[in-house]
Amino acid sequence: MGDREEIARFYDRGSDLMRELLEALAAAPEQLRTFPEVEDILAWPRRRIASVVGGVWHLRMTEFGGRRPYRFMDEDRSASGRWEIWVDTIQADAIRGAQGD
């Protein structure tokens, strides 16, 4: 997902936890981090990211054609050997803009 308006709409439609996750990712664009690293930053229990991301599946599929305003790298391709998550600079700018709306 790269359209600013679409990202802002996703931000608005997501849960408080999804917004918190997006804000944390937008604070460090282009920085790939494992789920536990992000969960530590947010002081979340383990596996919360999986729950939050899974919780917006229906929203993503029905309103956004499956697109998401964040990126994944699976464990087979990541340097850490674990799933990693991040946002690019365009996504981060759109998320920060949506925070102010």
Residue ranges of model-derived segments:
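Short amphipathic alpha-helical interaction segments
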Residues: 45-67
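Phospho-regulated, low-complexity intrinsically disordered regions of nuclear gene-regulatory
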Residues: 72-101
